[in-house]
Amino acid sequence: MAHYRASIDVQQPPEEIFAYLSDFSTTREWDPSVVEAERLNGEAVGEGTEFRLVAEFLGRKNELTYRIVEYDPPHAVTFLGENATVISRDRITFEPAPAATRVTYDADLALKGLLRIADPALALAFNRVGDRALAGLRRTLSPAHPQSVSRSSPSSGPAAA
C-alpha cells in the first residue's frame, strides 16, 4: 500500500475550502494527474455522492469511481475510490491554524490481487503524484499568497487484502 500525507495552510475559512474540496469534480482544477472529473449523482454533495475521475498514473489513464463515505462539514471528508486494479482512500481534514486553515490530505492507494507485488514501486510514484497535486492545490487555494507546506515522511505499509 502507498501512503501520502501532507498539509498546507491557506487563508480561506474552513467552510469555503470544505465546500470546494468535498466536490471531487473540482479535482481536475488542482491535480495535474486528473484529466477528467465529474459528479455522477445528486445536486448537493454529501455522504454517498459519487464521482468519476480519470487520472494519468505511470503513463496510463486509470478511471476510478469515488464515493463520499464520511462527510462532516467543515471538518473532514473521506472518499473511497475503486476500479478493477486499485482501491484509493482520500481523507481531507480542515483545522484552525494561526491566521489560517490547515488542510491535511491523507491518501492510501492499494493494488488488488497479484498486482500487490508492485506496491513498493507504487509508493514511490504515488508520493511524486501527491507532491504535484499538493502544489496545484496550494496554487488554486492561495494564488497570491505562497503558503507553508509540510509533508510527513513517505512510507509504504503492508498491502491491503
Q: Where do the PLM segments sit?
A:
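Extended beta-strand/beta-hairpin segments
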Residues: 1-3, 96-98, 149-152, 158-160
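Structural motif
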Residues: 11, 71-73, 97
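Glycine-rich portal/gate segments that line the openings of hydrophobic small-molecule binding cavities
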Residues: 38-86, 102, 132-151, 159-161
